[in-house]
Amino acid sequence: MKVDRGWGNCVIMAFLPERRWGTAMHNFLPIAYFENQFVPFEEAKLSIATHALHYGTGAFGGLRGIPDPQNPHQVLLFRLDRHCDRLSNSARFLNYDLPASKIQSVIVDLVKKNQPTASFYIRPFVYTSDLGIAPRLHNIEHNFFVYGLELGDYLSPEGVSCRLSSWYRQEDRSLPLRGKISGAYITSSLAKTEAVTSGFDEAILMNSQGKVSEASGMNIFIVRQGKLITPGFEQDILEGITRDSILTLARNLGIPVVERPVDKTELLIADEVFLSGTAAKITPVRQIENYQLSTNRPITHQLRDKLSAITENRDPEYSDWVFAIPV
């Protein structure tokens, strides 16, 4: 049976004849946080009448963690504080006051209770939890849950093929794109499925002005003449935490950085193209439409190696980006 799901959605491994990149084959962590308590994952269930299921009035985050390669008694989370801050800000769009400190406390306790032994991913989610109908964000209850799953490489580290999507990235004047609002990901899902059913791994979306915006759930970078170039916030992109990390690393490594509009044709003549995201990490792009891109990727590999060293707590210069949790 052929199955493809959108970014971050789950499939069951038994139904797949082979691994398809960009889907997650899930081994869920046994304990989840749901309705203000820690419960077995299989007991965390929502009513079919939950408001957020009908109107997309939820927001989510996602962060990676690994067992510490240098210390078997702790696990490492990458940029935990930034992820919690972003989700707290996203919750404000839902008229929900959820402090970042509360989110962080729950995530830390969740990791301690699960004691993961392999690379993993944490998904916190805030949502309107009332039962019933009528789209609104006032006079309504809110809640949040957190769960985790083991997750290795989400996209092929050797590189992915991308289709230029017929779907366009939404505009900030229509949706709060600085929050990871669940309802907004219908466009990502349409673009992803269009790409995969056409024989590609990923989708690249333009904005309403025809400029490059982002992939289905990742930011995009190109390299031209030694400069690292990426669309700016005015191109209706998500304020990616991995994106921010890459820009900081590049500047500190002496790589010229430019944030500006990127034309579609620039993707085809760039020296290097890569995607970035919490799940995707840094993933090279090897093909766009029927154009094969260069496999010589010195800046992509330099940044990926640097980011890997930081996430594994092997780079003391960026130790404040890594949150260690004893288990």
Where do the PLM segments sit?
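Helix-start/capping segments and mature chain N-termini
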Residues: F15-D109, Y127, G132-V327
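Phosphate/pyrophosphate-binding loops at sites that engage ATP/ADP/AMP, CoA/4′-phosphopantetheine
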Residues: L110-Q115
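Generic structural signal for secondary-structure transition and capping sites
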Residues: P116-S119, E312
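ATP-grasp fold ATP-binding core
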Residues: S119-V126
